[in-house]
């Protein structure tokens, strides 16, 4: 039987999810007990089990919440990206926002528990799909009309980039050392002017470049 509508949505449920995000962000998954989450949110811990079947269900709801919020933030910034330089700059800014929002911590903590709890791994995989599509759409936009468009598989590249970015996030979560990430974005910034000519649109037959 499905949960009643007031259990699926509403301000109380949102408050519980927000408290879970903040607790995981501050104390990690090991410290995100029902009591700790309730203390963070200032509510009775019995409410957690009224709205969620288990703590795992709440943890996944917390990840869904941060993932949706970050996706909206990324989509809002896509219009700012008109060149590879923009892509590197915006990418660095969004990474900083991911850290501050707690998304990286929530994701990393749940990934670490996925081997022991397959249902978590399956849901994380589902939540990664919109990020792969967003990445592929961005790549398609950059290569459209260029000589590299017919020779690359943007879907495979998108999968690889999302996995690579996830790896960067995992490393940062382990030691909080931003120097590696800074060095990586600095390298991308240096490579952008070199790569840009390869992404210039190819002359079209009948265009103004034709005699």
Predicted regions and their residues:
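Short, basic, alpha-helical segments at the C-terminal edge of helix-turn-helix-like DNA-binding modules
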Residues: 64-69
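Helix-turn-helix
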Residues: 15, 19-57, 61
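Residues in soluble alpha-helical coiled-coils and helical-bundle/repeat scaffolds
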Residues: 53-57, 78-82, 99, 115, ...
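Solvent-exposed, amphipathic alpha-helical segments
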Residues: 15, 19-26, 73, 77, ...
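Hydrophobic/aromatic-rich alpha-helical bundle segments in the mid-to-C-terminal region
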Residues: 85, 119-125, 129, 142-211
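Hydrophobic alpha-helical connector segments
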Residues: 61, 72-104, 154-161
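Short Lys/Arg-rich basic patches
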Residues: 2-6
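Amphipathic alpha-helical segments used for helix-helix packing
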Residues: 86, 99-125
């Amino acid at each position: 039987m499905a949960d009643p509508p007031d259990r699926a949505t509403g301000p109380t449920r949102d408050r519980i999810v927000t408290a879970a995000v903040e607790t995981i962000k501050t104390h990690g998954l090991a410290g995100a007990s029902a009591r700790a989450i309730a203390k963070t949110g200032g509510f009775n811990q019995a409410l957690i089990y009224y709205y969620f079947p288990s703590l795992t269900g709440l943890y996944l709801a917390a990840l869904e919440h941060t993932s949706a919020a970050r996706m909206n933030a990324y989509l809002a910034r896509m219009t700012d990206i008109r060149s590879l330089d923009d892509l590197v700059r915006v990418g660095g800014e969004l990474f900083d926002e991911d850290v501050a929002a707690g998304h990286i911590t929530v994701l990393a903590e749940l990934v670490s528990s996925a081997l022991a709890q397959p249902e978590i791994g399956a849901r994380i995989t589902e939540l990664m799909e919109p990020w792969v599509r967003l990445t592929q759409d961005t790549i398609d936009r950059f290569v459209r009309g260029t000589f590299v468009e017919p020779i690359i598989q943007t879907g495979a590249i998108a999968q690889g980039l999302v996995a690579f970015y996830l790896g960067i996030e995992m490393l940062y979560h382990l030691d909080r050392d931003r120097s590696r990430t800074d060095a990586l974005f600095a390298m991308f910034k240096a490579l952008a002017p070199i790569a840009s000519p390869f992404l210039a649109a190819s002359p079209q037959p009948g265009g103004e470049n034709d005699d």
